[in-house]
Amino acid sequence: MDLNTILIIVGIVALVALIVHGLWSNRREKSKYFDKANKFDRTSLTSRSHTQEEMVQPNNISPNTYVENGHTPISQPTTEKLPSEAELIDYRQSDKSVDDIKISIPNTQPIYDMGNHRSEPIQPTQPQYDMPTANNVASMTLEQLEAQSQNVGFNGINSSSPELRVQLAELSHEEHQVDYNLSFNEPKAETTAQPKQTTGYIQLYLIPKSSEEFNGAKLVQALENLGFILGKDEMYHRHLDLSVASPVLFSVANLEQPGTFNAYNLAEFNTIGIVLFMQLPSPGNNLANLRMMMRAAHTLAEDLQGVILTEEQEIFDANAEQAYLARV
């Protein structure tokens, strides 16, 4: 028999031995498991039923639940879970056991006995405040209250007192109260509205800024650009429809006597100033016509480097303009 055959036989024998050993070990472990399971059912359940039968009797377990041989329990469907051992404690003994408890620290004497102090409930003690009376607080100033709060220390002032709150609020209200009882019966300066001007003339003056005079040719050109037409009484007029046939809104006259413009000598004409005037009542709306005359005066002042004056020969500023508009 050669070496290869011997090795094959030895390997097969070893393999068979391993298989047999594994099966035997598996059966032994399984037998031990089932042995422990049967022993647990037999001892734990039976001992529990004997020790707890005086305390609680399960509703769904009958005395004939187990067979006489005691090997296999007969299981029956139950709707309620069996109470655990923690739930089966006799709570009637809890008060007595609590009384016997003593709390102590190692190497020291017991410092508290639950049984001796059980019948004596601890009464909460309320701190005593050295409070000033409400009348005194009400009469104090803010500085005195702050000093009092510092002197009382940790306890402070009991601001939760309703009476104290009311009196402090009244005191603060009296200190900060402002007398709003104004007398409305006092005579007031009556602002009488200025009566509207319905007749007469409204005038504006335009003069040069320097001592020079207005050049006639430039003046005529500026007037014609604004729609003025030389017409009646040898004056320039601003008509409603820019035609001689339409009504005159306002006019321009020469400040030099006789106040006319020489139509035949305009090239050599010079003047110290002109006056714009509007006769009331004017055609259409007096206020609209006055605004138009004011705009014409401002345009002429820019073109001719002039200054606008009021009827009182004062500078025609924004206030004077509002006063003119208020007249109509």
Curated annotation (Swiss-Prot):
Checking CDD domains in the record gives: ZipA
**What SMART domains does its record include?**
ZipA_C
**Which Pfam families does this UniProt record tie to the protein?**
ZipA_C
Q: Which domain of life is it from?
A: Bacteria
Tell me yes or no: is Disulfide bond among this UniProt entry's keywords. Answer: no
Q: Does the keyword NAD apply?
A: no
Its membrane topology is listed as: Single-pass type I membrane protein
Q: Where is the composition biased (Polar residues)?
A: 57-81
Q: Where in the cell is it found?
A: Cell inner membrane
GO:BP terms for this protein?
division septum assembly; FtsZ-dependent cytokinesis
Where do the TM regions start and end? 5-25
Principal localisation: membrane
**This protein's GO CC annotations:** cell division site; plasma membrane
Residues on the Cytoplasmic side? 26-328
The residues on the Periplasmic side of the membrane are 1-4
Keyword annotations: Cell cycle, Cell division, Cell inner membrane, Cell membrane, Membrane, Transmembrane, Transmembrane helix
- State the residue spans of region: Disordered: 44-82
Q: Describe its function.
A: Essential cell division protein that stabilizes the FtsZ protofilaments by cross-linking them and that serves as a cytoplasmic membrane anchor for the Z ring. Also required for the recruitment to the septal ring of downstream cell division proteins.
Which family is it part of? Answer: Belongs to the ZipA family.
Oligomeric state and interaction partners are given as: Interacts with FtsZ via their C-terminal domains.
Name-wise, this protein is: Cell division protein ZipA
